[in-house]
Curated annotation (Swiss-Prot):
Coiled coil: none annotated. Induction: Accumulates in shoots and roots upon potassium-starvation. This is AAA-ATPase At1g43910. Residues 306-328, 453-475 are annotated as: Disordered. Pfam families: AAA (PF00004), AAA_assoc (PF14363). The lineage of its organism: Eukaryota, Viridiplantae, Streptophyta, Embryophyta, Tracheophyta. ATP binds at G246, P247, P248, G249, T250, G251, K252, S253. SUPFAM superfamilies: P-loop containing nucleoside triphosphate hydrolases.
Protein backbone atom coordinates (compact mmCIF):
# COMPACT_ATOMS: atom_id res chain seq x y z
CA UNK A 1 0.00 0.00 0.00
CA UNK A 2 2.86 2.32 0.88
CA UNK A 3 4.46 1.50 -2.44
CA UNK A 4 1.23 2.44 -4.26
CA UNK A 5 1.00 5.80 -2.48
CA UNK A 6 4.62 6.52 -3.20
CA UNK A 7 3.90 6.29 -6.97
CA UNK A 8 1.20 8.98 -6.83
CA UNK A 9 2.74 12.41 -7.74
CA UNK A 10 2.56 15.11 -5.15
CA UNK A 11 0.29 18.13 -5.46
CA UNK A 12 3.27 20.40 -6.02
CA UNK A 13 4.51 18.19 -8.85
CA UNK A 14 1.08 18.23 -10.53
CA UNK A 15 0.83 22.01 -10.14
CA UNK A 16 4.34 22.43 -11.55
CA UNK A 17 3.45 20.27 -14.57
CA UNK A 18 0.23 22.24 -15.12
CA UNK A 19 2.12 25.54 -14.92
CA UNK A 20 4.69 24.36 -17.46
CA UNK A 21 1.99 23.09 -19.81
CA UNK A 22 0.06 26.39 -19.53
CA UNK A 23 3.20 28.40 -20.25
CA UNK A 24 3.98 26.28 -23.33
CA UNK A 25 0.38 26.62 -24.51
CA UNK A 26 0.42 30.41 -24.08
CA UNK A 27 3.76 30.62 -25.90
CA UNK A 28 2.49 28.49 -28.77
CA UNK A 29 -0.71 30.55 -28.98
CA UNK A 30 1.27 33.82 -29.01
CA UNK A 31 3.53 32.52 -31.78
CA UNK A 32 0.49 31.52 -33.84
CA UNK A 33 -1.21 34.90 -33.37
CA UNK A 34 1.94 36.95 -34.07
CA UNK A 35 3.53 34.97 -36.89
CA UNK A 36 0.78 33.04 -38.67
CA UNK A 37 -1.64 35.32 -40.63
CA UNK A 38 -5.29 35.30 -39.62
CA UNK A 39 -6.45 33.84 -42.92
CA UNK A 40 -4.07 30.89 -42.60
CA UNK A 41 -5.18 30.27 -38.99
CA UNK A 42 -8.81 30.25 -40.08
CA UNK A 43 -7.99 27.89 -42.93
CA UNK A 44 -6.12 25.46 -40.61
CA UNK A 45 -8.96 25.57 -38.06
CA UNK A 46 -11.54 24.90 -40.76
CA UNK A 47 -9.55 21.95 -42.14
CA UNK A 48 -9.07 20.53 -38.64
CA UNK A 49 -12.80 20.71 -37.96
CA UNK A 50 -13.56 19.08 -41.31
CA UNK A 51 -11.01 16.31 -40.65
CA UNK A 52 -12.29 15.35 -37.21
CA UNK A 53 -15.90 15.73 -38.26
CA UNK A 54 -15.47 13.24 -41.09
CA UNK A 55 -14.17 10.55 -38.70
CA UNK A 56 -16.11 11.10 -35.51
CA UNK A 57 -19.45 12.51 -36.65
CA UNK A 58 -22.34 11.14 -38.65
CA UNK A 59 -23.09 14.55 -40.20
CA UNK A 60 -22.38 15.76 -43.72
CA UNK A 61 -21.82 19.42 -44.60
CA UNK A 62 -22.45 21.14 -47.94
CA UNK A 63 -20.39 24.28 -48.56
CA UNK A 64 -22.20 26.89 -50.70
CA UNK A 65 -19.97 29.81 -51.65
CA UNK A 66 -21.22 33.17 -52.89
CA UNK A 67 -19.27 32.99 -56.17
CA UNK A 68 -19.24 30.05 -58.55
CA UNK A 69 -17.29 29.98 -61.82
CA UNK A 70 -16.95 33.78 -62.12
CA UNK A 71 -20.64 34.51 -61.44
CA UNK A 72 -22.93 34.68 -58.43
CA UNK A 73 -23.80 31.23 -57.13
CA UNK A 74 -27.53 30.87 -57.71
CA UNK A 75 -27.80 28.30 -54.90
CA UNK A 76 -26.29 30.86 -52.52
CA UNK A 77 -28.71 33.49 -53.81
CA UNK A 78 -31.66 31.12 -53.33
CA UNK A 79 -30.58 30.46 -49.74
CA UNK A 80 -30.35 34.23 -49.08
CA UNK A 81 -33.93 34.67 -50.27
CA UNK A 82 -35.41 31.56 -48.63
CA UNK A 83 -33.76 31.39 -45.20
CA UNK A 84 -35.34 34.57 -43.74
CA UNK A 85 -38.64 32.65 -43.85
CA UNK A 86 -37.12 30.18 -41.35
CA UNK A 87 -36.12 32.86 -38.85
CA UNK A 88 -39.50 33.49 -37.19
CA UNK A 89 -39.09 30.68 -34.67
CA UNK A 90 -35.34 30.96 -34.33
CA UNK A 91 -34.32 30.33 -30.70
CA UNK A 92 -31.12 32.31 -30.39
CA UNK A 93 -29.71 35.16 -28.38
CA UNK A 94 -29.39 37.40 -31.44
CA UNK A 95 -31.41 38.27 -34.52
CA UNK A 96 -30.43 40.47 -37.47
CA UNK A 97 -33.06 43.09 -38.31
CA UNK A 98 -33.06 46.20 -40.46
CA UNK A 99 -34.91 48.42 -42.90
CA UNK A 100 -33.83 50.26 -46.05
CA UNK A 101 -37.12 52.12 -46.42
CA UNK A 102 -35.92 55.73 -46.41
CA UNK A 103 -39.38 57.17 -47.00
CA UNK A 104 -40.94 55.37 -44.04
CA UNK A 105 -38.48 55.07 -41.12
CA UNK A 106 -41.30 53.71 -38.95
CA UNK A 107 -41.83 50.72 -41.26
CA UNK A 108 -41.55 47.31 -39.62
CA UNK A 109 -37.95 46.03 -39.93
CA UNK A 110 -37.26 42.86 -41.86
CA UNK A 111 -35.28 39.83 -40.75
CA UNK A 112 -31.80 39.22 -42.13
CA UNK A 113 -29.46 36.24 -41.93
CA UNK A 114 -27.05 36.62 -38.98
CA UNK A 115 -23.47 35.42 -39.37
CA UNK A 116 -22.34 32.33 -37.40
CA UNK A 117 -25.87 31.52 -36.22
CA UNK A 118 -27.58 28.18 -36.83
CA UNK A 119 -30.84 28.35 -38.75
CA UNK A 120 -33.00 25.23 -38.58
CA UNK A 121 -35.03 23.94 -41.51
CA UNK A 122 -37.01 20.72 -41.98
CA UNK A 123 -37.55 19.02 -45.31
CA UNK A 124 -39.74 15.91 -45.45
CA UNK A 125 -38.80 15.08 -41.87
CA UNK A 126 -35.06 15.69 -42.38
CA UNK A 127 -33.39 17.99 -39.85
CA UNK A 128 -31.19 20.61 -41.57
CA UNK A 129 -28.88 23.23 -40.10
CA UNK A 130 -27.79 26.31 -42.05
CA UNK A 131 -24.95 28.64 -40.99
CA UNK A 132 -23.71 31.76 -42.78
CA UNK A 133 -19.96 32.41 -42.52
CA UNK A 134 -17.96 35.50 -43.51
CA UNK A 135 -14.18 35.73 -43.92
CA UNK A 136 -12.20 38.89 -44.69
CA UNK A 137 -10.22 38.89 -47.91
CA UNK A 138 -7.86 41.28 -49.73
CA UNK A 139 -9.00 40.31 -53.23
CA UNK A 140 -11.63 42.11 -55.34
CA UNK A 141 -14.35 41.47 -52.78
CA UNK A 142 -13.81 42.71 -49.20
CA UNK A 143 -15.20 39.48 -47.74
CA UNK A 144 -15.82 35.88 -48.68
CA UNK A 145 -19.28 34.66 -47.70
CA UNK A 146 -20.48 31.07 -47.73
CA UNK A 147 -23.16 28.85 -46.21
CA UNK A 148 -22.71 25.54 -44.41
CA UNK A 149 -25.69 23.20 -44.77
CA UNK A 150 -25.45 20.22 -42.40
CA UNK A 151 -27.51 17.02 -42.45
CA UNK A 152 -27.08 13.35 -41.58
CA UNK A 153 -24.85 11.47 -44.01
CA UNK A 154 -27.60 9.09 -45.07
CA UNK A 155 -29.64 12.02 -46.44
CA UNK A 156 -26.86 13.43 -48.62
CA UNK A 157 -28.30 12.21 -51.94
CA UNK A 158 -31.83 13.24 -50.94
CA UNK A 159 -30.64 16.80 -50.29
CA UNK A 160 -28.76 16.91 -53.61
CA UNK A 161 -31.63 15.64 -55.73
CA UNK A 162 -34.70 17.06 -53.98
CA UNK A 163 -33.95 19.73 -51.38
CA UNK A 164 -31.86 22.05 -53.56
CA UNK A 165 -34.58 21.92 -56.23
CA UNK A 166 -37.15 22.80 -53.56
CA UNK A 167 -34.87 25.63 -52.37
CA UNK A 168 -34.57 27.14 -55.87
CA UNK A 169 -38.33 26.97 -56.54
CA UNK A 170 -39.18 28.45 -53.14
CA UNK A 171 -36.78 31.35 -53.68
CA UNK A 172 -38.19 32.01 -57.15
CA UNK A 173 -41.72 32.10 -55.74
CA UNK A 174 -40.69 34.51 -52.98
CA UNK A 175 -38.91 36.81 -55.45
CA UNK A 176 -41.94 36.90 -57.75
CA UNK A 177 -44.04 38.26 -54.86
CA UNK A 178 -41.45 40.58 -53.34
CA UNK A 179 -42.74 43.94 -52.17
CA UNK A 180 -39.82 46.22 -52.99
CA UNK A 181 -37.65 46.58 -56.03
CA UNK A 182 -34.08 47.77 -55.55
CA UNK A 183 -31.71 49.96 -57.51
CA UNK A 184 -28.02 49.13 -57.24
CA UNK A 185 -24.97 51.31 -57.71
CA UNK A 186 -21.41 50.01 -57.74
CA UNK A 187 -19.12 51.03 -54.88
CA UNK A 188 -15.55 50.85 -56.19
CA UNK A 189 -13.96 51.32 -52.77
CA UNK A 190 -15.71 48.22 -51.45
CA UNK A 191 -15.84 46.42 -54.82
CA UNK A 192 -19.50 45.52 -54.44
CA UNK A 193 -22.99 46.55 -55.52
CA UNK A 194 -24.90 48.58 -52.93
CA UNK A 195 -28.68 48.87 -53.03
CA UNK A 196 -31.49 51.23 -52.11
CA UNK A 197 -35.25 50.77 -52.28
CA UNK A 198 -36.54 51.67 -55.75
CA UNK A 199 -39.83 53.53 -55.32
CA UNK A 200 -40.29 55.20 -58.70
CA UNK A 201 -44.05 55.20 -59.29
CA UNK A 202 -44.00 55.48 -63.08
CA UNK A 203 -45.82 52.61 -64.76
CA UNK A 204 -47.01 52.03 -68.30
CA UNK A 205 -50.40 53.30 -67.11
CA UNK A 206 -48.97 56.69 -66.19
CA UNK A 207 -46.22 56.86 -68.82
CA UNK A 208 -46.95 59.56 -71.39
CA UNK A 209 -45.93 57.97 -74.71
CA UNK A 210 -47.73 57.18 -77.94
CA UNK A 211 -50.13 54.19 -77.51
CA UNK A 212 -48.62 52.19 -80.39
CA UNK A 213 -45.14 52.44 -78.87
CA UNK A 214 -46.47 51.47 -75.45
CA UNK A 215 -48.33 48.40 -76.76
CA UNK A 216 -45.37 47.26 -78.85
CA UNK A 217 -43.00 47.53 -75.90
CA UNK A 218 -45.31 45.76 -73.43
CA UNK A 219 -45.87 42.90 -75.88
CA UNK A 220 -42.12 42.61 -76.43
CA UNK A 221 -41.38 42.53 -72.68
CA UNK A 222 -44.08 39.94 -71.98
CA UNK A 223 -42.83 37.72 -74.79
CA UNK A 224 -39.29 38.00 -73.42
CA UNK A 225 -40.33 37.02 -69.88
CA UNK A 226 -42.02 33.87 -71.22
CA UNK A 227 -39.31 33.06 -73.76
CA UNK A 228 -36.92 30.81 -71.83
CA UNK A 229 -37.61 27.76 -73.99
CA UNK A 230 -37.50 29.82 -77.19
CA UNK A 231 -34.09 31.35 -76.44
CA UNK A 232 -32.76 27.92 -75.51
CA UNK A 233 -34.11 26.34 -78.71
CA UNK A 234 -32.42 28.93 -80.95
CA UNK A 235 -29.14 28.83 -78.99
CA UNK A 236 -29.20 32.41 -77.73
CA UNK A 237 -28.63 33.89 -74.29
CA UNK A 238 -31.87 34.75 -72.51
CA UNK A 239 -31.42 38.52 -72.59
CA UNK A 240 -32.93 41.54 -74.31
CA UNK A 241 -31.30 44.82 -75.27
CA UNK A 242 -33.02 48.22 -75.59
CA UNK A 243 -31.50 51.47 -76.86
CA UNK A 244 -33.44 54.54 -75.72
CA UNK A 245 -32.43 57.64 -77.66
CA UNK A 246 -33.73 61.16 -78.05
CA UNK A 247 -33.28 64.72 -76.75
CA UNK A 248 -32.91 65.38 -73.01
CA UNK A 249 -36.23 65.58 -71.16
CA UNK A 250 -38.12 63.13 -73.37
CA UNK A 251 -38.73 60.54 -70.64
CA UNK A 252 -35.93 57.99 -71.02
CA UNK A 253 -35.50 57.55 -67.26
CA UNK A 254 -39.27 57.27 -66.79
CA UNK A 255 -39.34 54.59 -69.47
CA UNK A 256 -36.70 52.60 -67.57
CA UNK A 257 -38.75 52.89 -64.37
CA UNK A 258 -41.89 51.71 -66.16
CA UNK A 259 -40.04 48.69 -67.56
CA UNK A 260 -38.66 47.80 -64.11
CA UNK A 261 -42.07 48.10 -62.45
CA UNK A 262 -43.75 46.07 -65.20
CA UNK A 263 -41.19 43.25 -65.10
CA UNK A 264 -40.57 43.39 -61.31
CA UNK A 265 -36.82 43.52 -62.01
CA UNK A 266 -34.12 45.15 -59.91
CA UNK A 267 -32.03 47.85 -61.64
CA UNK A 268 -28.21 47.90 -61.76
CA UNK A 269 -27.19 51.46 -62.63
CA UNK A 270 -23.60 51.38 -63.92
CA UNK A 271 -21.53 54.54 -64.39
CA UNK A 272 -19.33 53.11 -67.09
CA UNK A 273 -16.86 56.01 -67.12
CA UNK A 274 -15.70 55.06 -63.61
CA UNK A 275 -14.84 51.43 -64.42
CA UNK A 276 -11.08 50.94 -64.35
CA UNK A 277 -10.56 48.20 -66.94
CA UNK A 278 -12.14 45.27 -68.76
CA UNK A 279 -11.25 42.91 -65.92
CA UNK A 280 -13.18 44.99 -63.41
CA UNK A 281 -16.06 45.32 -65.89
CA UNK A 282 -16.25 41.53 -66.13
CA UNK A 283 -16.23 41.23 -62.33
CA UNK A 284 -18.97 43.87 -62.02
CA UNK A 285 -21.33 42.53 -64.67
CA UNK A 286 -21.08 38.86 -63.70
CA UNK A 287 -22.08 39.77 -60.14
CA UNK A 288 -25.51 41.05 -61.21
CA UNK A 289 -28.49 38.84 -60.41
CA UNK A 290 -30.86 37.17 -62.84
CA UNK A 291 -34.23 38.86 -63.50
CA UNK A 292 -32.60 42.28 -63.50
CA UNK A 293 -31.97 45.35 -65.65
CA UNK A 294 -28.47 46.60 -66.41
CA UNK A 295 -28.76 50.34 -67.08
CA UNK A 296 -25.95 52.31 -68.72
CA UNK A 297 -27.02 55.92 -69.22
CA UNK A 298 -25.38 58.28 -71.71
CA UNK A 299 -23.56 55.46 -73.46
CA UNK A 300 -22.25 57.98 -76.01
CA UNK A 301 -20.08 59.52 -73.27
CA UNK A 302 -18.52 56.13 -72.64
CA UNK A 303 -17.92 55.67 -76.36
CA UNK A 304 -16.26 59.10 -76.58
CA UNK A 305 -14.01 58.23 -73.66
CA UNK A 306 -13.07 54.96 -75.33
CA UNK A 307 -12.14 56.72 -78.57
CA UNK A 308 -10.08 59.32 -76.68
CA UNK A 309 -8.17 56.58 -74.89
CA UNK A 310 -7.49 54.76 -78.16
CA UNK A 311 -6.29 57.99 -79.81
CA UNK A 312 -4.06 58.84 -76.87
CA UNK A 313 -2.67 55.32 -76.81
CA UNK A 314 -1.66 55.55 -80.46
CA UNK A 315 0.07 58.89 -79.89
CA UNK A 316 1.93 57.64 -76.82
CA UNK A 317 2.89 54.35 -78.49
CA UNK A 318 4.45 56.27 -81.34
CA UNK A 319 6.56 58.42 -79.03
CA UNK A 320 7.76 55.84 -76.49
CA UNK A 321 10.80 53.66 -76.56
CA UNK A 322 10.13 50.14 -77.87
CA UNK A 323 12.25 48.75 -75.07
CA UNK A 324 9.61 49.50 -72.41
CA UNK A 325 6.51 47.53 -73.46
CA UNK A 326 5.61 46.62 -69.87
CA UNK A 327 5.56 50.29 -68.86
CA UNK A 328 3.33 51.18 -71.81
CA UNK A 329 0.90 48.39 -70.98
CA UNK A 330 0.58 49.47 -67.37
CA UNK A 331 0.04 53.08 -68.36
CA UNK A 332 -3.09 52.28 -70.38
CA UNK A 333 -4.75 49.69 -68.19
CA UNK A 334 -7.17 52.35 -66.89
CA UNK A 335 -10.51 52.49 -68.72
CA UNK A 336 -12.57 49.88 -70.53
CA UNK A 337 -12.51 49.09 -74.22
CA UNK A 338 -15.56 49.07 -76.46
CA UNK A 339 -14.89 45.43 -77.34
CA UNK A 340 -14.91 44.57 -73.65
CA UNK A 341 -18.37 46.09 -73.28
CA UNK A 342 -19.71 44.46 -76.44
CA UNK A 343 -18.56 41.08 -75.14
CA UNK A 344 -21.26 41.35 -72.50
CA UNK A 345 -23.90 42.61 -74.91
CA UNK A 346 -23.82 39.76 -77.41
CA UNK A 347 -20.42 38.07 -77.03
CA UNK A 348 -19.49 34.92 -75.15
CA UNK A 349 -19.85 36.59 -71.75
CA UNK A 350 -23.48 37.49 -72.51
CA UNK A 351 -24.39 33.89 -71.65
CA UNK A 352 -23.47 34.46 -67.98
CA UNK A 353 -26.82 34.56 -66.21
CA UNK A 354 -30.29 34.62 -67.71
CA UNK A 355 -33.47 36.69 -67.95
CA UNK A 356 -31.53 39.94 -68.05
CA UNK A 357 -32.41 43.20 -69.79
CA UNK A 358 -29.70 45.61 -70.95
CA UNK A 359 -30.73 49.24 -71.49
CA UNK A 360 -28.50 51.91 -73.03
CA UNK A 361 -29.63 55.54 -73.15
CA UNK A 362 -28.20 58.37 -75.22
CA UNK A 363 -29.10 61.91 -76.21
CA UNK A 364 -27.08 61.64 -79.41
CA UNK A 365 -27.52 58.38 -81.30
CA UNK A 366 -25.43 59.73 -84.18
CA UNK A 367 -22.39 59.92 -81.87
CA UNK A 368 -22.45 56.22 -81.01
CA UNK A 369 -19.80 53.90 -82.35
CA UNK A 370 -21.23 52.00 -85.35
CA UNK A 371 -20.36 48.76 -83.56
CA UNK A 372 -23.08 49.50 -81.00
CA UNK A 373 -25.70 49.96 -83.74
CA UNK A 374 -25.10 46.80 -85.74
CA UNK A 375 -28.18 44.57 -86.24
CA UNK A 376 -28.74 42.18 -83.36
CA UNK A 377 -26.54 44.06 -80.92
CA UNK A 378 -29.36 46.02 -79.25
CA UNK A 379 -32.62 44.26 -80.08
CA UNK A 380 -34.97 47.25 -79.96
CA UNK A 381 -34.22 50.92 -80.73
CA UNK A 382 -36.77 53.26 -79.15
CA UNK A 383 -36.97 56.93 -80.13
CA UNK A 384 -38.04 59.07 -77.19
CA UNK A 385 -39.20 62.10 -79.15
CA UNK A 386 -40.54 65.57 -78.41
CA UNK A 387 -44.04 66.16 -77.11
CA UNK A 388 -46.98 65.30 -79.39
CA UNK A 389 -50.68 66.26 -79.04
CA UNK A 390 -51.45 62.83 -77.58
CA UNK A 391 -48.64 63.07 -75.02
CA UNK A 392 -49.80 66.60 -74.14
CA UNK A 393 -53.35 65.41 -73.42
CA UNK A 394 -52.01 62.49 -71.39
CA UNK A 395 -49.93 64.85 -69.25
CA UNK A 396 -52.87 67.20 -68.72
CA UNK A 397 -55.05 64.27 -67.62
CA UNK A 398 -52.37 63.17 -65.14
CA UNK A 399 -51.48 66.53 -63.64
CA UNK A 400 -54.64 68.61 -64.02
CA UNK A 401 -57.25 65.83 -64.02
CA UNK A 402 -59.09 67.19 -67.03
CA UNK A 403 -59.79 65.77 -70.49
CA UNK A 404 -60.94 68.89 -72.34
CA UNK A 405 -60.35 72.64 -72.30
CA UNK A 406 -60.83 75.60 -74.60
CA UNK A 407 -57.04 76.03 -74.89
CA UNK A 408 -56.43 72.47 -76.11
CA UNK A 409 -56.68 73.27 -79.85
CA UNK A 410 -54.34 76.31 -79.89
CA UNK A 411 -51.82 74.50 -77.68
CA UNK A 412 -51.86 71.41 -79.91
CA UNK A 413 -51.18 73.59 -82.97
CA UNK A 414 -48.26 75.23 -81.17
CA UNK A 415 -46.87 71.83 -80.16
CA UNK A 416 -46.83 70.78 -83.82
CA UNK A 417 -45.05 74.01 -84.79
CA UNK A 418 -42.55 74.22 -81.92
CA UNK A 419 -40.35 71.42 -80.61
CA UNK A 420 -40.95 70.97 -76.88
CA UNK A 421 -40.01 68.07 -74.67
CA UNK A 422 -42.47 66.35 -72.31
CA UNK A 423 -40.33 67.63 -69.42
CA UNK A 424 -40.87 71.25 -70.53
CA UNK A 425 -44.61 70.74 -70.86
CA UNK A 426 -44.77 69.01 -67.47
CA UNK A 427 -42.91 71.88 -65.82
CA UNK A 428 -45.51 74.36 -67.08
CA UNK A 429 -48.43 72.15 -66.04
CA UNK A 430 -47.05 71.80 -62.52
CA UNK A 431 -46.93 75.58 -62.06
CA UNK A 432 -50.53 75.55 -60.82
CA UNK A 433 -53.24 73.06 -59.90
CA UNK A 434 -55.75 75.34 -61.59
CA UNK A 435 -56.21 74.13 -65.17
CA UNK A 436 -56.96 77.61 -66.55
CA UNK A 437 -53.80 79.12 -65.08
CA UNK A 438 -51.54 76.18 -65.95
CA UNK A 439 -52.73 75.87 -69.56
CA UNK A 440 -52.54 79.62 -70.10
CA UNK A 441 -48.95 79.56 -68.85
CA UNK A 442 -48.14 76.67 -71.19
CA UNK A 443 -49.67 78.52 -74.16
CA UNK A 444 -47.58 81.61 -73.39
CA UNK A 445 -44.46 79.47 -73.02
CA UNK A 446 -45.01 77.88 -76.44
CA UNK A 447 -45.80 81.26 -78.04
CA UNK A 448 -42.51 82.65 -76.72
CA UNK A 449 -40.64 79.65 -78.12
CA UNK A 450 -42.33 80.22 -81.48
CA UNK A 451 -41.33 83.90 -81.51
CA UNK A 452 -37.77 83.06 -80.56
CA UNK A 453 -37.65 80.43 -83.27
CA UNK A 454 -38.78 83.03 -85.82
CA UNK A 455 -36.17 85.53 -84.64
CA UNK A 456 -33.42 82.91 -84.84
CA UNK A 457 -34.52 82.02 -88.38
CA UNK A 458 -34.43 85.70 -89.41
CA UNK A 459 -30.94 86.14 -88.00
CA UNK A 460 -29.79 83.01 -89.79
CA UNK A 461 -31.27 84.19 -93.11
CA UNK A 462 -29.63 87.62 -92.73
CA UNK A 463 -26.31 85.93 -92.09
CA UNK A 464 -26.68 83.82 -95.22
CA UNK A 465 -27.53 86.94 -97.30
CA UNK A 466 -24.49 88.80 -95.96
CA UNK A 467 -22.24 85.83 -96.77
CA UNK A 468 -23.63 85.69 -100.30
CA UNK A 469 -23.11 89.44 -100.83
CA UNK A 470 -19.56 89.21 -99.52
CA UNK A 471 -18.71 86.40 -101.92
CA UNK A 472 -20.29 88.31 -104.82
CA UNK A 473 -18.27 91.44 -104.00
CA UNK A 474 -15.06 89.44 -103.87
CA UNK A 475 -15.70 88.03 -107.33
Amino acid sequence: MATLYSQVPSVSAVFSLYTSFSAITMLFRTILNEIVPKRIREYIAMKAVDFFSSYFQSDFTFVIEQRWEFVENQTFRAAEVYLPTCLAGLSTGKLLVGSSNLKNPAAEPKLGIPVNTKIIDNFEGIHLEWTLHSVETKKYLPEKRYFHLTCKKEFREKIMTDYFTYLAKSAEKIMSHRENLKIYTYNQDRSKWESAIFEHHTTFETLAVEPDLKKTLIDDLDAFSKGKDFFKSVGRAWKRGYLLYGPPGTGKSSMVAAIANHMKYHIYDLQIQSVRDDGELREILTSTKNRSILLIEDIDCGADASRRRQSKKKEEDGGEDDGEPQKRKKKFEVGISLSGLLNFVDGLWSSCGEEKIIIFTTNHKEKLDPALLRPGRMDVHILMDNCTPFVFKKLVALYLKTDEHVLFDPIEKLILEVSSTPAEVTQQLMASKNADIALKGLAEFLENKKLKKGEDSSVEEEGEIEDAETKEAET
